[in-house]
């Protein structure tokens, strides 16, 4: 009887080799694949960061893609004016020029979703006239008292361009457009030798229970906080301060048993709006232990320390950046720094350093 391997044994050996080779390939792929989880409360800027990644690493948006944002931008603009006009009623603020009442009715007659290739001329004209009204401006200055999109002023100031029949959205128009994220979206980018898989999850409270258990093996968490919202209340619960909510959420993520070995990068975002607000809306009104007055650097230090001090793990480092997610040049620089951090973390996780 010969001592050669049976056909069955040969097939078994071949299968084992195939499995081992696949495992080696998977490990190599894993080393070059970065899973990044984007977290933060609603409207903190997560989707804007994803748009920036497309602009920076994929050469931006094609004409067709820009065209596809038009209806979102029209709807955002009209809806923002509607929100201000409704707030004027509840705050009992009259129009400065009562002749503009005709334009108020034009806005209220528009559907929630504006459809079509161009904004109707009467709607563009109504927004242009109303935005110049002193009563509307007074209500806008009190926007922390109601729920208004960050992009409102930008779109109102650009209304003549947006309402033009041949309008094509530019990069800033696209970056500032707002669609509520529900569920989990995955976006893939190639940066150098690395493949980034970025997961964006809905920031509103109702979405959060879907988060944690799905993402135990992510490389990095990018956590965004809109620091300009220190004086605002939650969209979902107008008894809760937005910054307090962000602190609570960061505490739960930073100290979660699921993310003990996961590096966390903290973007303290919307610094442009934060700087504008500090002189007119004292932070001490909302955080009584803050003593820095309207000083921008002192306010930044205070907020940074409030977040970083929540970390209960001595060995876990929180990497922090102050950001303006709509500023492409700044985000390009910050994301390059983030990329360096992630490469180091990835090498460490793979046991190569």
Curated annotation (Swiss-Prot):
InterPro entries linked: Fungi_Gprotein_alpha, Gprotein_alpha_su, GproteinA_insert, P-loop_NTPase
Cofactor(s) named in the record: Mg(2+)
Domain of life from the UniProt record: Eukaryota
GO BP of this protein: G protein-coupled receptor signaling pathway; pheromone-dependent signal transduction involved in conjugation with cellular fusion
Protein name: Guanine nucleotide-binding protein subunit alpha
Binding site for Mg(2+): 47, 181
Source organism of this protein record: Cochliobolus heterostrophus (strain C4 / ATCC 48331 / race T)
Region (G3 motif): 196-205
